[in-house]
Protein backbone atom coordinates (compact mmCIF):
# COMPACT_ATOMS: atom_id res chain seq x y z
CA UNK A 1 0.00 0.00 0.00
CA UNK A 2 2.86 2.40 0.84
CA UNK A 3 4.37 1.79 -2.60
CA UNK A 4 1.01 2.67 -4.15
CA UNK A 5 1.00 6.08 -2.46
CA UNK A 6 4.62 6.70 -3.40
CA UNK A 7 3.75 5.99 -7.04
CA UNK A 8 0.77 8.36 -6.84
CA UNK A 9 3.00 11.12 -5.49
CA UNK A 10 5.57 10.54 -8.26
CA UNK A 11 2.86 10.64 -10.94
CA UNK A 12 1.42 13.81 -9.43
CA UNK A 13 4.81 15.52 -9.41
CA UNK A 14 5.47 14.46 -12.99
CA UNK A 15 2.14 15.88 -14.15
CA UNK A 16 2.00 18.96 -11.91
CA UNK A 17 4.60 21.12 -13.67
CA UNK A 18 3.23 20.49 -17.20
CA UNK A 19 -0.26 21.27 -15.90
CA UNK A 20 0.91 24.53 -14.34
CA UNK A 21 2.79 25.39 -17.55
CA UNK A 22 -0.39 24.87 -19.57
CA UNK A 23 -2.36 27.15 -17.25
CA UNK A 24 0.41 29.73 -17.47
CA UNK A 25 0.33 29.51 -21.26
CA UNK A 26 -3.41 30.17 -21.38
CA UNK A 27 -3.03 33.04 -18.93
CA UNK A 28 -0.17 34.67 -20.87
CA UNK A 29 -1.97 34.42 -24.22
CA UNK A 30 -5.15 35.96 -22.79
CA UNK A 31 -3.16 38.64 -20.98
CA UNK A 32 -1.17 39.59 -24.09
CA UNK A 33 -4.38 40.15 -26.06
CA UNK A 34 -6.53 41.94 -23.51
CA UNK A 35 -4.21 44.02 -21.31
CA UNK A 36 -3.94 47.57 -22.73
CA UNK A 37 -0.60 48.59 -24.23
CA UNK A 38 1.67 50.42 -21.80
CA UNK A 39 3.05 53.86 -22.63
CA UNK A 40 6.68 52.77 -22.42
CA UNK A 41 8.14 56.28 -22.49
CA UNK A 42 5.92 57.50 -19.67
CA UNK A 43 6.47 54.39 -17.56
CA UNK A 44 10.22 53.96 -18.02
CA UNK A 45 11.96 57.07 -19.41
CA UNK A 46 13.05 58.93 -22.53
CA UNK A 47 15.82 56.72 -23.91
CA UNK A 48 16.05 53.06 -24.88
CA UNK A 49 19.43 51.38 -25.38
CA UNK A 50 19.53 48.49 -27.85
CA UNK A 51 22.60 46.33 -28.41
CA UNK A 52 23.06 44.41 -31.65
CA UNK A 53 20.67 46.80 -33.36
CA UNK A 54 21.71 46.83 -37.03
CA UNK A 55 20.05 43.55 -38.07
CA UNK A 56 17.35 41.13 -37.07
CA UNK A 57 15.33 41.36 -33.88
CA UNK A 58 17.48 44.15 -32.44
CA UNK A 59 16.88 46.39 -35.44
CA UNK A 60 13.15 45.68 -35.40
CA UNK A 61 12.94 46.40 -31.66
CA UNK A 62 14.77 49.71 -32.21
CA UNK A 63 12.22 50.80 -34.82
CA UNK A 64 9.28 49.63 -32.71
CA UNK A 65 10.56 51.49 -29.64
CA UNK A 66 11.00 54.63 -31.77
CA UNK A 67 7.42 54.30 -33.02
CA UNK A 68 6.37 54.36 -29.38
CA UNK A 69 8.16 57.65 -28.80
CA UNK A 70 11.47 56.67 -27.24
CA UNK A 71 14.83 58.05 -28.28
CA UNK A 72 17.20 55.24 -29.22
CA UNK A 73 20.83 54.57 -28.34
CA UNK A 74 22.13 52.22 -31.02
CA UNK A 75 25.13 50.08 -30.05
CA UNK A 76 26.82 47.81 -32.56
CA UNK A 77 30.19 47.35 -34.25
CA UNK A 78 29.46 48.41 -37.85
CA UNK A 79 29.47 52.22 -38.16
CA UNK A 80 27.95 52.35 -41.64
CA UNK A 81 25.04 50.11 -40.61
CA UNK A 82 24.59 52.16 -37.43
CA UNK A 83 24.41 55.37 -39.43
CA UNK A 84 21.87 53.85 -41.83
CA UNK A 85 19.62 52.61 -39.01
CA UNK A 86 19.93 55.95 -37.20
CA UNK A 87 18.95 57.86 -40.33
CA UNK A 88 16.00 55.56 -41.04
CA UNK A 89 14.68 55.84 -37.48
CA UNK A 90 14.90 59.63 -37.39
CA UNK A 91 13.17 59.83 -40.79
CA UNK A 92 10.38 57.55 -39.61
CA UNK A 93 9.72 58.93 -36.12
CA UNK A 94 10.10 62.24 -34.32
CA UNK A 95 12.82 60.94 -32.00
CA UNK A 96 16.55 61.32 -31.42
CA UNK A 97 19.17 58.65 -31.88
CA UNK A 98 22.68 58.24 -30.55
CA UNK A 99 25.30 55.94 -32.06
CA UNK A 100 27.94 54.04 -30.07
CA UNK A 101 30.33 51.75 -31.90
CA UNK A 102 31.39 48.72 -29.89
CA UNK A 103 32.56 45.23 -30.76
CA UNK A 104 31.19 43.12 -27.91
CA UNK A 105 33.46 40.22 -28.84
CA UNK A 106 36.39 42.25 -27.46
CA UNK A 107 35.16 41.85 -23.90
CA UNK A 108 36.11 44.09 -20.99
CA UNK A 109 37.94 46.82 -22.91
CA UNK A 110 34.84 48.31 -24.60
CA UNK A 111 32.70 49.14 -21.58
CA UNK A 112 34.51 52.21 -20.29
CA UNK A 113 33.67 54.10 -23.47
CA UNK A 114 30.05 52.89 -23.42
CA UNK A 115 29.73 54.05 -19.81
CA UNK A 116 30.99 57.52 -20.71
CA UNK A 117 28.63 57.80 -23.69
CA UNK A 118 25.60 56.83 -21.59
CA UNK A 119 26.45 58.93 -18.53
CA UNK A 120 24.15 61.92 -19.14
CA UNK A 121 21.17 60.09 -20.63
CA UNK A 122 17.88 59.25 -18.92
CA UNK A 123 17.89 55.56 -19.83
CA UNK A 124 14.45 54.06 -19.42
CA UNK A 125 14.89 50.74 -21.20
CA UNK A 126 17.92 48.54 -21.85
CA UNK A 127 17.47 45.81 -24.44
CA UNK A 128 20.31 43.29 -24.21
CA UNK A 129 19.77 41.84 -27.65
CA UNK A 130 23.26 41.31 -29.07
CA UNK A 131 24.07 37.66 -29.63
CA UNK A 132 25.77 35.26 -32.00
CA UNK A 133 25.27 31.64 -32.94
CA UNK A 134 27.69 29.08 -34.34
CA UNK A 135 28.74 29.54 -37.95
CA UNK A 136 26.87 26.27 -38.45
CA UNK A 137 25.97 23.34 -36.15
CA UNK A 138 29.14 21.53 -35.12
CA UNK A 139 30.75 19.32 -32.52
CA UNK A 140 32.14 21.31 -29.60
CA UNK A 141 35.66 20.13 -30.38
CA UNK A 142 35.42 21.72 -33.84
CA UNK A 143 34.76 25.21 -32.46
CA UNK A 144 37.74 27.54 -32.96
CA UNK A 145 39.00 29.07 -29.71
CA UNK A 146 38.33 32.58 -31.00
CA UNK A 147 34.71 31.69 -31.72
CA UNK A 148 34.31 30.29 -28.20
CA UNK A 149 35.57 33.52 -26.62
CA UNK A 150 33.44 35.64 -28.94
CA UNK A 151 30.31 33.72 -28.02
CA UNK A 152 31.03 33.99 -24.29
CA UNK A 153 31.85 37.70 -24.49
CA UNK A 154 28.81 38.52 -26.63
CA UNK A 155 26.09 36.16 -25.40
CA UNK A 156 26.99 36.26 -21.71
CA UNK A 157 29.38 39.14 -21.07
CA UNK A 158 27.45 41.85 -22.94
CA UNK A 159 24.16 41.48 -21.05
CA UNK A 160 25.98 41.18 -17.74
CA UNK A 161 28.13 44.27 -18.21
CA UNK A 162 25.46 46.44 -19.84
CA UNK A 163 23.13 45.66 -16.95
CA UNK A 164 25.86 46.68 -14.51
CA UNK A 165 26.20 50.03 -16.30
CA UNK A 166 22.53 51.06 -16.32
CA UNK A 167 21.16 49.44 -13.18
CA UNK A 168 22.36 51.95 -10.52
CA UNK A 169 20.53 54.92 -12.09
CA UNK A 170 17.38 52.88 -12.58
CA UNK A 171 17.47 51.90 -8.91
CA UNK A 172 18.01 55.50 -7.79
CA UNK A 173 15.04 56.82 -9.79
CA UNK A 174 12.93 53.72 -9.01
CA UNK A 175 11.95 53.05 -12.61
CA UNK A 176 13.30 51.45 -15.75
CA UNK A 177 13.24 48.20 -17.68
CA UNK A 178 15.93 45.67 -18.55
CA UNK A 179 15.06 43.19 -21.31
CA UNK A 180 17.36 40.22 -21.86
CA UNK A 181 17.03 38.20 -25.06
CA UNK A 182 17.31 34.52 -24.26
CA UNK A 183 15.88 31.81 -26.52
CA UNK A 184 13.54 28.84 -26.59
CA UNK A 185 16.74 26.78 -26.70
CA UNK A 186 17.04 27.41 -22.94
CA UNK A 187 14.60 24.53 -22.39
CA UNK A 188 17.13 21.77 -22.98
CA UNK A 189 20.75 21.14 -23.95
CA UNK A 190 21.15 21.23 -27.72
CA UNK A 191 23.78 18.94 -29.24
CA UNK A 192 25.74 20.65 -32.03
CA UNK A 193 24.71 24.04 -30.58
CA UNK A 194 26.08 23.22 -27.15
CA UNK A 195 27.63 26.52 -26.05
CA UNK A 196 24.95 28.67 -27.68
CA UNK A 197 22.11 26.90 -25.84
CA UNK A 198 24.09 27.02 -22.58
CA UNK A 199 24.52 30.79 -22.96
CA UNK A 200 20.75 31.19 -23.28
CA UNK A 201 19.96 29.31 -20.08
CA UNK A 202 22.52 31.57 -18.38
CA UNK A 203 20.54 34.63 -19.50
CA UNK A 204 17.30 33.09 -18.26
CA UNK A 205 18.72 32.32 -14.80
CA UNK A 206 20.56 35.65 -14.61
CA UNK A 207 17.33 37.52 -15.38
CA UNK A 208 15.24 35.52 -12.91
CA UNK A 209 17.69 36.06 -10.06
CA UNK A 210 18.06 39.75 -10.90
CA UNK A 211 14.29 40.18 -10.78
CA UNK A 212 14.15 38.66 -7.29
CA UNK A 213 17.04 40.81 -6.04
CA UNK A 214 15.37 44.01 -7.29
CA UNK A 215 11.70 43.07 -6.84
CA UNK A 216 10.98 46.16 -4.69
CA UNK A 217 12.97 48.61 -6.82
CA UNK A 218 10.26 49.62 -9.31
CA UNK A 219 12.29 48.14 -12.20
CA UNK A 220 10.84 45.75 -14.78
CA UNK A 221 13.29 42.93 -15.52
CA UNK A 222 12.11 40.79 -18.41
CA UNK A 223 13.44 37.72 -20.17
CA UNK A 224 12.35 37.24 -23.78
CA UNK A 225 12.71 33.67 -25.03
CA UNK A 226 11.68 33.51 -28.69
CA UNK A 227 11.63 30.36 -30.73
CA UNK A 228 12.58 30.69 -34.40
CA UNK A 229 12.32 34.14 -35.99
CA UNK A 230 13.34 34.70 -39.61
CA UNK A 231 16.77 36.32 -39.17
CA UNK A 232 20.30 36.02 -40.51
CA UNK A 233 21.43 34.32 -37.30
CA UNK A 234 19.91 31.12 -38.73
CA UNK A 235 21.79 31.55 -42.00
CA UNK A 236 22.85 27.89 -42.04
CA UNK A 237 19.28 26.68 -42.68
CA UNK A 238 16.84 27.78 -45.38
CA UNK A 239 14.10 25.99 -43.44
CA UNK A 240 14.57 28.16 -40.34
CA UNK A 241 14.30 31.36 -42.37
CA UNK A 242 10.96 30.61 -44.05
CA UNK A 243 8.33 32.98 -42.68
CA UNK A 244 5.16 31.40 -41.28
CA UNK A 245 3.04 31.68 -38.15
CA UNK A 246 5.66 29.81 -36.10
CA UNK A 247 8.60 31.66 -37.68
CA UNK A 248 7.52 35.30 -37.87
CA UNK A 249 9.40 38.12 -39.54
CA UNK A 250 11.29 40.40 -37.16
CA UNK A 251 8.79 43.27 -37.31
CA UNK A 252 5.91 41.02 -36.28
CA UNK A 253 7.95 39.57 -33.45
CA UNK A 254 9.14 42.98 -32.18
CA UNK A 255 5.60 44.38 -32.11
CA UNK A 256 4.23 41.48 -30.08
CA UNK A 257 7.28 41.30 -27.81
CA UNK A 258 7.09 44.96 -26.79
CA UNK A 259 3.40 44.56 -26.01
CA UNK A 260 4.45 42.17 -23.23
CA UNK A 261 6.92 44.58 -21.59
CA UNK A 262 5.65 45.52 -18.15
CA UNK A 263 2.94 42.86 -18.46
CA UNK A 264 4.73 39.48 -18.48
CA UNK A 265 8.21 39.07 -16.98
CA UNK A 266 9.29 35.80 -18.59
CA UNK A 267 7.78 35.14 -22.00
CA UNK A 268 8.44 34.01 -25.53
CA UNK A 269 7.11 37.42 -26.60
CA UNK A 270 4.86 35.96 -29.29
CA UNK A 271 1.81 33.83 -28.57
CA UNK A 272 2.40 31.03 -31.15
CA UNK A 273 5.84 30.59 -29.58
CA UNK A 274 4.18 30.30 -26.18
CA UNK A 275 2.09 27.44 -27.55
CA UNK A 276 5.29 25.78 -28.81
CA UNK A 277 6.83 26.26 -25.38
CA UNK A 278 3.85 24.64 -23.66
CA UNK A 279 3.91 21.63 -25.99
CA UNK A 280 7.67 21.24 -25.46
CA UNK A 281 7.22 21.28 -21.69
CA UNK A 282 4.90 18.28 -21.94
CA UNK A 283 7.74 16.18 -23.33
CA UNK A 284 10.39 14.54 -21.13
CA UNK A 285 13.81 16.16 -21.26
CA UNK A 286 15.41 13.18 -23.02
CA UNK A 287 12.94 13.45 -25.90
CA UNK A 288 13.54 17.20 -26.26
CA UNK A 289 17.31 16.68 -26.29
CA UNK A 290 17.03 13.82 -28.79
CA UNK A 291 14.79 15.78 -31.18
CA UNK A 292 16.98 18.91 -30.94
CA UNK A 293 20.10 16.86 -31.59
CA UNK A 294 18.56 15.18 -34.63
CA UNK A 295 17.37 18.51 -36.03
CA UNK A 296 20.72 20.24 -35.71
CA UNK A 297 22.63 17.24 -36.97
CA UNK A 298 20.46 17.42 -40.11
CA UNK A 299 21.00 21.19 -40.40
CA UNK A 300 24.73 20.49 -40.16
CA UNK A 301 24.56 17.90 -42.95
CA UNK A 302 22.50 20.23 -45.16
CA UNK A 303 24.94 23.10 -44.65
CA UNK A 304 28.03 21.01 -45.36
CA UNK A 305 26.36 19.45 -48.40
CA UNK A 306 25.99 22.93 -49.89
CA UNK A 307 29.73 23.42 -49.56
CA UNK A 308 29.32 25.72 -46.54
CA UNK A 309 28.39 28.64 -48.76
CA UNK A 310 27.09 31.67 -46.88
CA UNK A 311 23.38 32.29 -47.30
CA UNK A 312 22.58 35.93 -47.98
How would you name each of these model-derived features?
Residues 205, 211-290:
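SDR active-site lid
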Residues 68-84:
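Conserved glycine-rich Rossmann-like NAD(P)H-binding loop of the short-chain dehydrogenase/reductase
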Amino acid sequence: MELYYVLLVIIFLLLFKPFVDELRTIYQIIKSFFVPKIDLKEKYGDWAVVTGCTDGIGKALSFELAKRGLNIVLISRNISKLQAVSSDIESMANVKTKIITADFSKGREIYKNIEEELRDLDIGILVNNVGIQYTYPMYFGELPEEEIWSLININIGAATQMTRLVLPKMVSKKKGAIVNLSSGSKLQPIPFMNLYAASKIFLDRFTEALRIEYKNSGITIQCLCPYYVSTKINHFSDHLRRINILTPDVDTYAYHALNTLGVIDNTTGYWPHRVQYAVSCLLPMWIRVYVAGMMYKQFRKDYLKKGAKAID
